[in-house]
Amino acid sequence: MRPTEEKIQKDPSDLPIYLFKQGNNCEAYRYFGAHLETRAGESGVVFRVWAPHAAAISVVGDFNSWKPGSHPMRKVDGDSVWELFIPGVKEYDVYKYCVTTRGGDLIYKADPYAFHAETRPSNGSKVYDITGFAWHDDAWQAAQKKADVINGPMNIYEMHAGSWKLKDEKVPYNYSELADELIPYIREMGYTHVELLPVMEYPFDGSWGYQVTGYFAPTSRYGTPKDFMAFVDKMHEAGIGVIMDWVPAHFPKDGFGLYNFDGEACYEDPNPKRGEHKEWGTMVFDFGRSEVQSFLISSALYWLEQYHIDGLRV
């Protein structure tokens, strides 16, 4: 038995990190990110982030006037995973990670595992509790278990939530309004599923969502995460499946995002010949890195499990 495995038997809390570094943590979002907790009778938020090259990290946000160093994180594994519990932080508080690079520079990063984010042009992460939504799609879920998904009929309507219909020249429908508009149209036209162009958080409208910065956050352009859950729930109650585009091929170079997350390549391939998509000006994931594998697998399963998405188009 390897020493790491012996340690895990003594302290099961090390298991998420162990699996993460093996590329086998399929629910890394349950550990990393910002999670509401109560410790020693005090409610607050525990923050965890992976940053293998960082010299130091602090959590900054509305709760400390965005002052670097006010809430320094500590390494929980002696290596690359950082953690901090901050009492008093609450849902919807905006935050970022202030990373001190090995070269001494300060960079401000959104949380790769954030469940919610500010609406562009702002780009901070938001504390959010994704639990507690009351689903009403039991009948749909039961029917899908019996359905012949390979040979059964399927007619898919692809659409972009931000431009399909607008309330005026610039304002799109929110998630709830979108469902109310879509359902009668899809039924009338005989579609079985709606396929959404990417709804994971992204900064640039012109990308149509194909330059993702938030792999665990539905875009706040149209509402909150639970608003998006309600969208899926309404579709299922109407007998309509929901497929979403999931974009693991590349990610943008926005300074607050995954690119050079701790001042050096973390999520992207460090070899520029493999790590950059020259045509798009975006970065390519380091698919051979275990931590990146855990990140991407967790993202894919997150949408299926937490949002009841019926399928992903890659």
Placement of each model-derived feature along the sequence:
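Structural beta-strand segments of beta-rich domains
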Residues: 43-48
